[in-house]
Amino acid sequence: MTQKKPIIGITPSHNTENNDTSLRPTYPKAIAAAGGLPILLPLECSDEDIKQFMDVCDGFLFTGGPDINPFLFGEDTHLKCGNISAARDHLEFRLLSAAMDAGKPIFGICRGVQVLNVGL
């Protein structure tokens, strides 16, 4: 019998200039190479969707990308901040809270570590 692969939910990048979401192919490739089954999470989802992700996913990868909104950690937006996505911030902070409550493993890369730092 084949062992069930862990399902890993991956947060998408969001380009606010054209409202595109994307994912670097290296993220799902790395998860698959480690024996996981990667799935891309939608940028916009309800609280019910977040709850369902907790039932479906065994862990979560918070990917790299532009900075989170400095307002979320009590700072003003610096002129050098680019492409701040309120939609991505909203998804990732709700997802982080739910994953922590559910005891799910979380891994952050670059921006993902910023989310963990601010969210915890």
Labelled PLM ranges:
Residues 1-109, 117-119:
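N-terminal beta1-alpha1 cap of cysteine-dependent amidohydrolase-like domains
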Residues 113:
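Catalytic nucleophile loop
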